[in-house]
Regions:
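An amphipathic, hydrophobic-aromatic interaction surface with interspersed Lys/Arg
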Residues: 1-259
């Protein structure tokens, strides 16, 4: 686990899937899901506005309406003055000054954020980014079939090509063809991820929780172990084991039918 000094407190942070409890990772993932889809600061407000405008201009009113609904929720979170991204970091805080921080309710996470609230934003962001990068790296290394995102690679390839085109415009001077290409790639990047619903019964938060509970039941039934007491490493190892066994059973079933 990682040690850090934040707002005068000695903080212990989970930074490895070997130790990170799955219940914390689930909550952490859900907070990042909300942060990515709704956000809670003025930059997120501006991003929603731009995306809604672009969707509507393209005639995609359904996604435009979803963006406006997410914009409304973003405004609510801004007024609450609580960053969802900060709450995701709070999920990874194991101890503050030697005392365990086991309350993963929203109130408990807010209390952690309050205790660390005097930390300069740059330091807070640095700690979260470092821990997130390490966890993401371990997940893609150990479970590439589950976490290696080909779509993300395509997105970053487009971003790289756009950056090169912008630099060429600066060095060689603007051309109409290059301007059109830059605008096309900008629109592709801005609209790359379709907006999700974060309100009502179809909320992705509700679906996220239901899928997790369903998978915990499956793992517990198949392995006779409590999935909610597993680390992230143990949980996804169990998931892959169950998936392999299901494929083998399916193959055996197919062979019996053809025999």
């Amino acid at each position: 686990m990682k040690k850090a000094k934040l707002n005068g407190h000695k903080v212990t942070i989970y930074d490895s899937i070997d130790e990170l409890p799955m219940v914390r990772f689930h909550k952490y993932s859900k907070m990042l899901l909300v942060d990515a889809g709704v956000g809670s600061d003025i930059n997120d407000f501006d991003a929603h506005l731009e995306r809604a405008t672009r969707f509507i201009r393209k005639g995609d009113n359904e996604n435009g309406a979803k963006e406006l609904e997410n914009l409304r929720q973003c405004v609510y979170l801004i007024l609450q003055e609580q960053s969802v991204r900060d709450l995701s970091f709070a999920c990874l805080v194991a101890e503050i000054d030697g005392k365990p921080t086991d309350d993963l309710s929203e109130q408990g996470l807010c209390e952690v954020c309050k205790m660390l609230g005097g930390t300069p934003r740059v330091d807070f962001t640095k700690e979260l980014d470092e821990v997130k990068k390490k966890i993401d790296s371990e997940l893609t290394t150990y479970f590439p079939d589950l976490f290696d995102d080909a779509g993300a690679r395509e997105y970053y390839d487009t971003m790289k090509r756009r950056t090169v085109a912008v630099l060429e415009n600066i060095i060689e001077g603007e051309t109409e063809a290059r301007d059109r290409m830059i605008e096309s790639m900008t629109e592709m990047m801005v609209l790359y991820v379709k907006p999700k619903t974060f309100a009502g019964r179809q909320s992705v938060e509700i679906q996220h929780d239901k899928e997790y509970e369903s998978m915990c039941l499956t793992i517990s039934r198949e392995t006779h172990a409590d999935a909610k007491k597993m680390t992230v490493m143990e949980y996804y190892n169990a998931y892959e084991y169950i998936r392999r066994m299901a494929k083998e059973r399916q193959k055996l079933g197919s062979k019996r039918k053809t025999a």
